[in-house]
Amino acid sequence: KKIKVNNTLNFLSNCSNLVRKASKIKAIAITGSSGKTSLKELLSQCLNKIASTSYSKKSFNNKFGVPISLFNIQKNNIFGVFEVGMDKKGEINHLTKLIMPDLGVITNISYAHIKNFKNLYEIALAKSEMINNIISGGSIVLNKDDKFFNFLKNKSLKKKLKVISFSEKNNADIRMIKITRKKSNYLLILKISNNVKKFIIKESLKFYIVNILATIAVISNYTDVQSLKENFFY
C-alpha cells in the first residue's frame, strides 16, 4: 500500500523517532571528524557480547541513514549504536534529536568537514550540538588528547552530563599505560580510574588503540570494566 506524504524525508524522520521513543534501548550516538565508523563497528561488536545491540549499518550517518538505522531497532535490543555525520551546521542537532542518546561520543575535531565551515572552532561548535540532545542525566565520552576537549567538557558540564575521558598520553578516566608485544598478539595495559586493567588484543587492533579506549569508556558507563575478561577484544 502506498502512502502519499508532503515531504518524504520529514515523514521518514518523524516515524523513525516514534520507533526510538517506543524502544527502551540505551542509545549511543557517535560523532567526530574521523574514526566514527571504525569505532561504531568495534563498540557494537563489544556491546553485543554484553547484551543484544542494534547498530548503524555501513556508514548510515546522514539524514536518510540515521532514520533507517532507527527503524532497525528490535524489541530485544538493550543497546543501540548510531553513527552521526554532518555536512553543515544544525545537522547533528537534527539527527541526535531523533536518536535521543543516553550517551554521546565525540571522537575528535579536525579539518575533515571544513568545506562548509570557516575554522575548527565552527566545526567543534557544530559537533557539540549533540550535547544538547543527550537525555537528562546522560553521559558523554570525550577524547582528552583533542585540543577542543576542555571546550566540549565545559559545555557538557553546563548540561549536567557525566563526562568520561579517554587518552593515550594524558591523565584521564581511561588511559593507556603501555602496549607490549606478547607472542603473536599485544598486551594492552590501561589505567581505569585508579585501577589497572589488562587486555590481549590482536595485531590488527594495535592501530586502533583510540577506538579501544573510547569503547572501554562507553562500556564503563554501563558495567564494571574490571569484570571483562582479558581476551574481551580478541
For the regions a protein language model found, what residue spans apply to each?
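Phosphate-binding loop of NTP-binding sites
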Residues: 9-144, 148-159, 217-220
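Adenine nucleotide phosphate-binding catalytic loops in nucleotide-utilizing enzymes
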Residues: 120-124, 157, 161-234
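Conserved beta-strand termini and adjacent loop/short-helix elements that scaffold enzyme active sites
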Residues: 5, 56, 143-144, 166-169, ...
